[in-house]
A protein has these predicted regions:
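A beta-rich soluble binding module of mature secreted/lumenal proteins
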Residues: 2-3, 26-197
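Bacterial N-terminal signal peptides that target proteins for export
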Residues: 2-15
Length: 197
C-alpha cells in the first residue's frame, strides 16, 4: 500500500499476504467492507517519487496490524534480476509507542499497464496481495510524493501515508476529505499514534 513490519515476517507477515490476496478464510474473519466500490487509482505513480520512508497516519484496522502504533513503511530498490524489484520494510510498536518493536521485510512488483499505481506485494513466499495507490500528492521540492492513500479491491483495507510523522491540520483534513470522496466509510478509520517531533 509502508517503517512497517517486514512482510513476510513470521505469522503476521503470512496473515498480511494471505488476507491481501483474498485468502482470508485461511486466517480468520477479515474486517468489514468500508468501500463496496473501490475506484481505480486516480493518477499515475512514479516509483522514484514513491520510494523512501512513509508514516502511517491512519488505517482500517486489520488482524495482522492489530494494536500497532508508530507504523512506518520504507520502500527501496532491490538488487534482483526478477520483476519484484522493490523492497518493503514495515515496522510498528505493539500496543503502544513504548511497546515491543516489530519489523517485517517483503518485496513488491509493479503491475504492468497500471501506470505504476498498482503493486503486488509479498511478505511470504509466492503469495502476493494487491496494493493500489488510489491517490497521492504532487511531488514536493525533493521530488517525492508528500502523501498517499492506499487500498485494494475488496474495500476492507485502507492506509493513509504521509512523509511526516505528524502531518499538519490542513493535510489531515485533506486526507479525510479525499478518503470520503473515494467512497470509504470514515467511521472505520483508526488513526495511528506517532512519536512527537
Amino acid at each position: 500500500m509502508i517503517r512497517t513490519a517486514p512482510h513476510p515476517f513470521s505469522i503476521r507477515a503470512f496473515i498480511l499476504a494471505t488476507c491481501a490476496a483474498g485468502l482470508s478464510a485461511c486466517v480468520g474473519a477479515p474486517g468489514p467492507v468500508g468501500n463496496a466500490s473501490v475506484p481505480e487509482p486516480a493518477r499515475p505513480v512514479s516509483l522514484a517519487a514513491y520510494l523512501g520512508q512513509w508514516y502511517e497516519y491512519g488505517r482500517y484496522e486489520a488482524p495482522f496490524q492489530k494494536g500497532c502504533e508508530g507504523v512506518t513503511a520504507e520502500y527501496s530498490l532491490r538488487e534482483t534480476s526478477g520483476d519484484a524489484r522493490i523492497r518493503v520494510i514495515n515496522s510498528c510498536y505493539k500496543d503502544g509507542l513504548d511497546g515491543e518493536f516489530d519489523q517485517s521485510t517483503g518485496k513488491a512488483k509493479v503491475v504492468e499497464g497500471s501506470d505504476g499505481a498498482k503493486l503486488k506485494v509479498s511478505f511470504f513466499g509466492p503469495f502476493y496481495g494487491d496494493y493500489w495507490v488510489l491517490d497521492r500528492g504532487e511531488p514536493g521540492v525533493d521530488g517525492t510524493y508528500p502523501w498517499s492513500i492506499v487500498g485494494e479491491p475488496s474495500g476492507r483495507y485502507l492506509w493513509m501515508l504521509t512523509r511526516e510523522a505528524q502531518p499538519d491540520a490542513a493535510l489531515k483534513a485533506a486526507l479525510e476529505a479525499r478518503v470520503r470522496e473515494l467512497g470509504y466509510d470514515w467511521s472505520l478509520v483508526r488513526l495511528t499514534q506517532q512519536p512527537p517531533p
